[in-house]
């Protein structure tokens, strides 16, 4: 397919916050074979360039002065079977939840806890998306990339080479702007290995009358939980969890626990402790807070929402207010999850 470039494009349909900003130039990448032509195009070469997936982890505060490329690569295929394991490849532009549901329908298990996470397959390793005790790295085999500095030549990164961390990967650091994710390969399983340890999941399964859950039951429970807590971006603009759960030294967590005995906490790597950002924000009295059309969601304090006409700058100002308030009360720094431009 020939690439089509458009000028002065409204980006509201392409970002889940619904920010009314415009791109100087825009094109959609439907076929990886078009990458060399895209990389050679004057609009790409003069830059800047923003690669866009689902636009669900992005806060746009101003018009974008360069080229926005919407990655719409599609396709899901079973590469091979390895005993009970199924090696499955999904193209970067596939909707994440759609892919999870397709996998479940085929009897390929392991991603059910990650149901209904917004965004695309291509963004999943960048952010190392996670929920309810599972991260994408747990099932990811390798990532297929295009090398942007080598005319789009393909490269494959192993799980280890992706250097996954909490909501982090090599794609946010050395590989940023150099590697474009074009497909992700997963090691899924015919055997169910359910992760139902989170209280919310147990309660939802109980409410659903499920005693012996299947992976599909777990997926349905996760979907029900997320729908009950998180606003639909089609109705109320948002980017899901706006802040990462902070990870602090054990001594700091212990000191906080003395002052706040109800403090939710979870073990993290290197003896550190992960805190619940939503709880910290809630304890500051900010759940449901609103400044104009920029607000903190009234059911999940971790989510910032656009009530209609908030600008990106207003959303950023609200985020800073939340960060400052939490820092003053708890001495804890909150780090935003979305890319802010």
UniProtKB/Swiss-Prot annotation:
Gene Ontology annotations for the cellular component aspect, listed alphabetically: cytosol
Keyword flag Oxidoreductase: yes
Coiled-coil region(s): none
Superkingdom of the source species: Bacteria
Annotated ranges, domain FAD-binding PCMH-type: 19-191
Keyword DNA damage attributed: no
Gene coding for it: murB
Function: Cell wall formation.
GO BP terms: cell division; cell wall organization; peptidoglycan biosynthetic process; regulation of cell shape
Keywords attached to this entry: Cell cycle, Cell division, Cell shape, Cell wall biogenesis/degradation, Cytoplasm, FAD, Flavoprotein, NADP, Oxidoreductase, Peptidoglycan synthesis
Pathway the protein acts in: Cell wall biogenesis; peptidoglycan biosynthesis
Residues the record marks as active site: 167, 241 (proton donor), 337
InterPro entries: FAD-bd_PCMH, FAD-bd_PCMH-like_sf, FAD-bd_PCMH_sub1, FAD-bd_PCMH_sub2, MurB, MurB_C, MurB_C_sf, Oxid_FAD_bind_N
Subcellular localization, as worded in the UniProt entry: Cytoplasm
Pfam name, any one: FAD_binding_4
Catalytic activity: UDP-N-acetyl-alpha-D-muramate + NADP(+) = UDP-N-acetyl-3-O-(1-carboxyvinyl)-alpha-D-glucosamine + NADPH + H(+)
Family matches, as HAMAP family: MurB
Family designation: Belongs to the MurB family.
Protein name per the record: UDP-N-acetylenolpyruvoylglucosamine reductase
EC number in record: 1.3.1.98
GO MF annotations, alphabetized: FAD binding; UDP-N-acetylmuramate dehydrogenase activity
Originating species: Chromobacterium violaceum (strain ATCC 12472 / DSM 30191 / JCM 1249 / CCUG 213 / NBRC 12614 / NCIMB 9131 / NCTC 9757 / MK)
Cofactor: FAD
